[in-house]
Structures are given as C-alpha cells and as structure tokens.
C-alpha cells in the first residue's frame, strides 16, 4: 500500500489509464490532432469522427440521442448554460426559477446572478436527509415558473433526489427541469428516454475522465431552446462556440463507455468498501451520518464526529486525502452551507468529514484509513475539555458562555 491514500473521489478522480491512452492518440503529429471543424481535409474529418464517437458514447450511458449532447468545459459551464440559457430565452413567459439551498455553487451563484438581472429565485430547504421532495417543489410552483434546477446526487452528502417523480410534476405543469448529474453519472442509472428531464449537466473528471470537459444534455423532444453564453463560430449548433478539444472529448467518451460497462459491478464493490469502512468507525461515540441513510450513493460517506473540530481531524489524518465540505468551498472556515441547510448545528457541521471511495480504492486502504480515523478522533477528544464535560453528563448546549 502506498501513502498518501486518496479518499476524495467526489472532488475529482484520476484519469483511467485506458482513457489516457485514447487521449494520447489525439495529440501528436502522427495522431488524430486535426480541428474537427476543418471540413476540407482528412485531418478534420478524422477529428470530427472521433468527436462524434465520443458524443455517441456519452449519449449511450444516459440513453439519449447523440444530437442532444452539447460539449462544454465542464459541469460548471453546463449549469451556467442551462440556467442562463433558459432564463434569457424564456423570460417573456415568466421570470421565476426554483432551486434548492444545497445545490452546487455553480447553480447557486448563477441563480444569484439571474436575481441581479431581475429574475426571482425560490431556494427550497431540503429535508434533514438532504432530499428535495416533489411535494416541496409543487408547493412553490407558480404560473410564471419557467425552470426547476435540482441536483441528482448531492456532492457533499451523497443523497439522491427522486428526479423521475419531480420530472413528472414539472412536465405536467409545462415547466423546464434541469438536473446537475455531475455526481451521479456512472454511479446511478440514468435513462433519459424515460426521465422527464429537459437539461442535464455532466462532467468528465468525476467519471475518471480528464478535467476541462463536460456536456449538457438538451432535450429535442420536447424541444428546449437556449440562448448561448459563448459566441464565435457557431459550433455545437450555435449553443456553445469554440474549437472542440478532440483529445478531451475522446477521453470523456471513453470514460463514459467504461462507466456504462462496469457500473453495476463497481457499485457493488464500492458499497462493500464503504460498509467495511463504516463498520470499523461506527464504534466511535457521537458519530453522525450526514444525508440520507437509504437514498444515497455508496461512494460518498459524510460523517460528523461530535466534539472534534473537522479541520484538526483533517490535519491529524495527514496521509489520508479527505475533505470537509466541497472542494470548491472548503478553503473557507465557514461551516458547510449544505450541512447547515440540513439542520445540523454549527458544531456538527464543523466536525464533518467527507470520505469518498472510488475505482482505485482498496480494502487495505479502507482498513488503514478507518484505523487512523479512530485513533485521531480518540486522541483529539482526550485533549478536549468539551468532551470531558460531555462524559461527565453536562449538557453543553445549555451552557451560557461568558465573554471576557
């Protein structure tokens, strides 16, 4: 076993060697390096063929028509294009958008920007399990609602929203439905022939593909119209201009093809690893699982260790890569906005750690990590006066601390 151990697969994944090989074939002078938009020679034709093959591979994982896949630079851009594209195109129909308080910042910050432009956004509060129910959405739907945007799997706590039921609701009311599937693609089955989802965002680097490439599914039946946010050249049917990065697209296609092939077996393996890890740490007192206990992906295990500061626990686990909060926001010392929205108090939110398991995680790594977590938590609690008080039966929440 090699140290350090990577248990932060929800932040990013390494590129699968099979993917890297396919990408390498598209870079050098004797490879497939042409511009896919060059229509006048074989270099361009070959590149375009590779791009269309990648488009087909992405579409096959989610059972969509390849013509419904638009290449972007990643899920953040896909979210921006979906929200701004719909808002600007359909604003004459209405200016009300619904999302939730625990979306990724790519959706929340875009929603805030749309508010500055005069749109009205309702931010739903999820249940304690991190799930937004169809009833919650129905309660705030209005005649001027044009879009509902909700994630499929939450990036911090791994809970799964019932997008099938929410899609039935939005479709029946004539409201467009966008789903951020960055954390669910390759982990949860997605069938866009059955799901009533109009727009769906994807990222390659969460599925063992390269960073810097993603896609947006844009439904053709019923047809969804978008106003572009990047102009110049009219690539991707005018929805997203810019020379297509053949090697990135080939990488994303191959990554999604591998995911389709291996998803069922891999999910079972990851669940066994996650259960094995949890069993070993579950003897710790005052341990809380964040998010849903049942509707969750096994890849993500978000735990709060009460009376332990999450940052100090991170420091103690120096040869284990895990995170507190999402990678995009974990630089700030604010407690996770996701956990606070789930009703966790600041202490528990501050003591949370996200463990995420993936394709290259081994049993040996999981055992080592679990042992180190138990050692670190016990050691930090020994140093904590709050832990002593808790053990002595003092209800810490009732104490009024004096300021000096």
Swiss-Prot record:
Cystines in this chain: none
Coiled coil stretches, renumbered: none
Record's protein name: Cysteine desulfurase IscS
Protein EC: 2.8.1.7
Protein's cellular compartments: Cytoplasm
Entry binding sites for pyridoxal 5'-phosphate: 75-76, 155, 183, 203-205, 243
HAMAP family: Cys_desulf_IscS
Protein origin, superkingdom: Bacteria
Subunit details: Homodimer. Forms a heterotetramer with IscU, interacts with other sulfur acceptors.
Major enzyme class: transferase
Record: active site: 328
Keywords: 2Fe-2S, Cytoplasm, Iron, Iron-sulfur, Metal-binding, Pyridoxal phosphate, Transferase
NCBIfam families: IscS, PRK14012.1
Cofactor(s) this protein cannot do without: pyridoxal 5'-phosphate
Gene field: iscS
Classification via Pfam families: Aminotran_5
Single Gene Ontology BP annotation: [2Fe-2S] cluster assembly
GO molecular function: 2 iron, 2 sulfur cluster binding; cysteine desulfurase activity; metal ion binding; pyridoxal phosphate binding
Pathway: Cofactor biosynthesis; iron-sulfur cluster biosynthesis
Binding locations of [2Fe-2S] cluster: 328
GO cellular component, one term: L-cysteine desulfurase complex
Membership in a protein family: Belongs to the class-V pyridoxal-phosphate-dependent aminotransferase family. NifS/IscS subfamily.
InterPro entries assigned: Aminotrans_V_dom, Aminotrans_V_PyrdxlP_BS, Cys_deSase_IscS, Cysteine_dSase, PyrdxlP-dep_Trfase, PyrdxlP-dep_Trfase_major, PyrdxlP-dep_Trfase_small
Catalytic activity: (sulfur carrier)-H + L-cysteine = (sulfur carrier)-SH + L-alanine
Modified residues annotated as N6-(pyridoxal phosphate)lysine in this record: 206
Function text: Master enzyme that delivers sulfur to a number of partners involved in Fe-S cluster assembly, tRNA modification or cofactor biosynthesis. Catalyzes the removal of elemental sulfur atoms from cysteine to produce alanine. Functions as a sulfur delivery protein for Fe-S cluster synthesis onto IscU, an Fe-S scaffold assembly protein, as well as other S acceptor proteins.
């Amino acid at each position: 076993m090699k140290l350090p151990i990577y248990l932060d697969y929800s932040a990013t994944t390494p590129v699968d060697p099979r993917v890297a090989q396919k990408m390498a074939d598209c870079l050098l002078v004797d490879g497939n390096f042409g511009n896919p938009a060059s229509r006048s020679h074989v270099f361009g034709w070959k590149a375009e063929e590779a791009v269309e093959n990648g488009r087909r591979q992405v579409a096959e994982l989610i059972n969509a028509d390849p013509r419904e896949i638009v290449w972007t630079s990643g899920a953040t851009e896909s979210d921006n294009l979906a929200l701004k594209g719909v808002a600007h195109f359909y604003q004459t129909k209405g200016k009300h958008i619904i999302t939730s308080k625990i979306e990724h910042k790519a959706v929340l910050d875009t929603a805030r920007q749309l508010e500055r432009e005069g749109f009205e956004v309702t931010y739903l509060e999820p249940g304690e399990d991190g799930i937004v129910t169809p009833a919650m959405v129905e309660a705030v739907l209005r005649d001027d609602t044009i879009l509902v945007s909700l994630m499929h799997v939450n990036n911090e706590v791994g809970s799964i929203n019932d997008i099938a039921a929410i899609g039935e609701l939005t479709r029946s009311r004539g409201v467009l439905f966008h789903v951020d599937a960055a954390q669910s693609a390759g982990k949860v089955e997605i069938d866009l022939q059955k799901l009533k989802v109009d727009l769906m965002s994807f990222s390659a680097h969460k599925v063992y593909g390269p960073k810097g490439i993603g896609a947006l599914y844009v439904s053709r039946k019923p047809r969804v119209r978008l106003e572009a946010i990047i102009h110049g050249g009219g690539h991707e049917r005018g929805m997203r201009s810019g020379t297509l990065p053949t090697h990135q697209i080939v990488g994303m296609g191959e990554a999604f093809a591998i995911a389709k092939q291996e998803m069922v077996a891999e999910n079972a393996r990851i669940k066994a690893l996650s259960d094995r890890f949890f069993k070993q740490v579950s003897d710790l007192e005052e341990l809380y699982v964040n998010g849903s206990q049942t509707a969750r992906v096994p890849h993500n295990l978000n735990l709060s260790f009460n009376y332990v500061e999450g940052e100090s626990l991170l420091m103690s686990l120096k040869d284990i890569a895990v995170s507190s909060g999402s990678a995009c926001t974990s630089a700030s010392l604010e407690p996770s906005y996701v956990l606070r929205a789930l009703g966790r108090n600041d202490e528990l939110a501050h003591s949370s750690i996200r463990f995420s398991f993936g394709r290259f995680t081994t049993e040996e790594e999981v055992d080592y990590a679990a042992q180190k977590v138990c050692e670190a938590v016990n050691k930090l609690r020994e140093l904590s006066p709050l832990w002593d008080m808790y053990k002595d039966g003092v209800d810490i929440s009732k104490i009024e601390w004096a300021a000096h």
